[in-house]
Amino acid sequence: MKKSLMALIVVGSFLLSACALRPDTIVNTPLTARPQAASTIAPPANGAIFQAAAYRPMFEDRRARLIGDTITIVINEKSSAGKQAGSAASKTGSVTASAPNVFGLLGSLTNRLSASGSNAIKYEDKGAVTSSNNFISTMTVTVIDVLSNGNLIVAGEKQVSLDKGSEFIRFSGVVDPSTVNSGNIVSSTQVADAKIEYRTNSTVDGAEVASMLARFFLSVLPL
């Protein structure tokens, strides 16, 4: 009795935790970064007016350039694809046979002994597949690294908790600073190597995992 009760408790704990599962991700980079600590060594003075270490353009807004800066990504992704395939094949054949006439003997009889046949095979196959996706959202990501050419590696995650679960929007990619608009805004279509995903851990996803766990434990319970 105690073993059965403990097994039921274990099953119940898995069922409750299934709803809080964090879905897997295709974004394999850190999702945020903190600004680098200021150096205690004074940067070299490489000019009387222009200082590369503290350069900020005079006639433009403050733009993301350093690790820890933020950029707003406007996600507007649309994709559609279609594929059609078809094949056809046919084959026909015929055969005739007759009995030989041996030295003219039994000619009248063998002329009547003949056979013929024909066959036809036809095959045709057609298929079509279409797919269409539309993803529109806005999120702010963090610069996690700066490449040697000045391009920015950005990544971030946005979580939205709803009544029956949580939604996860994750993003990563490489941003060319010249494509960043006023207000530190860039379109997702201008981000290189972009990885965009939308996942949930709603009760539907949790129910699928819970169902598998329940079947496993119920199969070993002495009920």
Curated annotation (Swiss-Prot):
GO molecular function: cytoskeletal motor activity
UniProt keyword terms in alphabetical order: Bacterial flagellum, Cell outer membrane, Lipoprotein, Membrane, Palmitate, Signal
UniProt signal peptide: 1-18
InterPro entries referenced in this protein's UniProt entry, alphabetically: Flag_Lring (IPR000527)
Protein localization: Cell outer membrane; Bacterial flagellum basal body
Lipidation (N-palmitoyl cysteine): 19
PROSITE patterns assigned to the protein according to its UniProt record, in alphabetical order: PROKAR_LIPOPROTEIN
Pfam families: FlgH
Lipid attachment site numbers (S-diacylglycerol cysteine): 19
GO cellular component, one term: cell outer membrane
Lineage: superkingdom: Bacteria
Bilayer topology: Lipid-anchor
GO terms under biological process: bacterial-type flagellum-dependent cell motility
Protein task: Assembles around the rod to form the L-ring and probably protects the motor/basal body from shearing forces during rotation.
Family the UniProt entry places it in: Belongs to the FlgH family.
Subunit structure and binding partners: The basal body constitutes a major portion of the flagellar organelle and consists of four rings (L,P,S, and M) mounted on a central rod.
Protein name: Flagellar L-ring protein
Organism: Herminiimonas arsenicoxydans
Gene: flgH
